[in-house]
Every structure is written in structure tokens, then in C-alpha cells.
Amino acid sequence: MQRSLKWFASATTLAMLFVLIGGALVTKTGSGMGCGRSWPLCNGQWVPDHITPELIIELSHRLVSGLAGIMVLILSIWAWRAIGHVQETKFLAVISFVFLVLQGLIGAAAVVWGQSDFVLALHFGISLISFAAVLLLTLLIFEIDKTFSAASLSLDGKMRFHIYGITIYSYIVVYTGALVRHTNASLACPSWPLCAKTRLLPVQFHEWVQMGHRLAAAVIIIWIAAAAIHAVRHYRRQPVIYYGWLIALLLVLAQMTTGALVVFTQLNLYIALAHAFFISCLFGVLSYLLLLALRTRRAPVKAADHSAGEAAPATLK
């Protein structure tokens, strides 16, 4: 694989991560209207004459997103030509660019015409899909699957259920988290993990949004912990699965910690951005596990020595 392609893929992945964090920064700082209802111009000007912090944040996010879009398009074409023989390459190349354009259109529509909070909450999730596709393309370019002998993987039904279920469910958790941001419900509940020390249930809309996200997050933490335990017990000799779930567990615990700290620190900006960073990384890990699971589903089932003394996947319960 050409070294230049690897470098460019890495840079594009990093650029997409900046798009995600930048979008979270725009929302957290209330900078979405920093350029007024003007797009792609800023307040109807190419070079704004009245500079505010909100304008700088919004304009920077637009510039980074535009640069990332160009980089993703170049990477998609380059990867298509260089590793198009790898089955997932063309699909990921298309998804990465299409979803990045889609999130840009939603962002532009929100500025020009305005959108409901429920529609705006999709903005981060759509960007996340594009980021995951770029990340997977990068991993294919680096041939990570060969490094971990991913071609010889064999997964039992329970592990496949965990991978498919958690990956899909994580997107729901992401949406609820984005909804918390867009409805300004981050500090609706002054306590943690309960909404308030004096009562158990929320009493108004913003509290329900906040507690709905906390409940969704609690479920995914428990579910990922269960998947990690299953991986530790049965997949010690398949490191990509074993370490993949351990990393996912660490990331979701970091996500939980930063989520709690957002409340305790009264919405500290750096902690809030770390919260967005950890969920982006977690979704990337889950997406790679999903790619591997889809590969093994297509491939003939092979007897796998998951761990010393364990039976093949077909006999696991």
C-alpha cells in the first residue's frame, strides 16, 4: 500500500473527527447563528466585518467541514482505485462522502430556514456515520484486518447478537445525546444519576429528555459490559474481538464519566467536548466490529479455538 495514501487517509480521519468536535462546539456555545441566516456566506459577506466569538466558531466549523468534504472525496476516489478489490471499499467510499454532504445540507438548512430540535439532533449522527466510514476505509488501507488475522474469525451467535444489537442501539443513544444538546437540556437535572435528590421521576420536558438519555446510556453500558465479559471468556485467542470489546468498555465508561462531570461542573466546555470525542471513538470501534461480523456471516463457518479448552462457536451457548 502506498505510504502517501496511508498518510492521507489518517489526515482525513482526523479531519472528520474535527468536524464532529467542531459541530459539538457550535452547539455547546450556541454559535449556530454566528453567521446569521446566511450560507455559505457569513452575514451575507465573504469576509465578515463584524467579528464575534460565535462567528469565529461557526465560520471555522464551516471551513473545516468544507476542507474535510474535499479530503473525503479525494480519499474515496483514491481508495476506490487503490483497494477497490477489497469488498467493502466501494460501499464505504460512497457512504463516507454521501453522508458528509447530507450533514452539510442539514446544517445549511438549519441556518437558512431553521429546523426543529428533533431534526437538528440527526446532524451529529449523520456526521458520525461519515466519520465511521472514513475510519473503516483507513483501517482497510492500513490492512489492520491482516494484522489481527481477521480473515480467520469465527463468531458464535451470541457475539453476533451483541455486535449487531449494540451498534444499532448506540446510534439511538447518540441521537438522545444530541437531542439533549439541541433542546438545551444538559443541565435540566441538577443531580446525577437521578434527576433530583428529592424525587425519582422527571416532571417536565427537558428533564424527560435528559433522563431518557441517561437511561439509554445506562443500558448500553450494561450491554457493552456483558459483551466484554463474553469476549474475555470465549475470545482470548481472537485479539481483534477480545481487545475490541475491552476498548469499547473503556470508552463507554469514559463516556459515562464525562457525562456525569458535565453535570457536576455545570457544563464545562472541555468536558462536554470530551464527551463528544469518546462517543465518536466508541462508534468507530463498534463499526469495525460490525464490519468483521458481516464478513464472518458471509464466510463459511470455521471451527475456531476461542480459548484454551473452549468448544467451537457452533457449540457455544
From Swiss-Prot:
GO biological processes: heme A biosynthetic process
EC assignment: 1.17.99.9
Lipid bilayer topology: Multi-pass membrane protein
Main location: membrane
Reported cofactor(s): heme b
Binding site for heme o: H61, H123
UniProt-annotated catalytic positions: E58
Subcellular location: Cell membrane
Cytoplasmic side: 1-6, 84-90, 143-159, 233-243, 292-317
Pathway: Porphyrin-containing compound metabolism; heme A biosynthesis; heme A from heme O: step 1/1
Domain free text: The N-half (TM1-TM4) and C-half (TM5-TM8) domains are connected by an intracellular loop. Each domain is formed from four-helix bundles and they align in a pseudo twofold symmetry manner. The N-half domain is the substrate-heme O binding domain and the C-half domain is the cofactor heme B binding domain. The cysteines of disulfide bond Cys-35 and Cys-42 may be involved in transfer of reducing equivalents from quinol in the membrane to the active site of the enzyme.
Function of the molecule: Catalyzes the conversion of heme O to heme A by two successive hydroxylations of the methyl group at C8. The first hydroxylation forms heme I, the second hydroxylation results in an unstable dihydroxymethyl group, which spontaneously dehydrates, resulting in the formyl group of heme A.
Protein name: Heme A synthase
Encoding gene, per UniProt annotation: ctaA
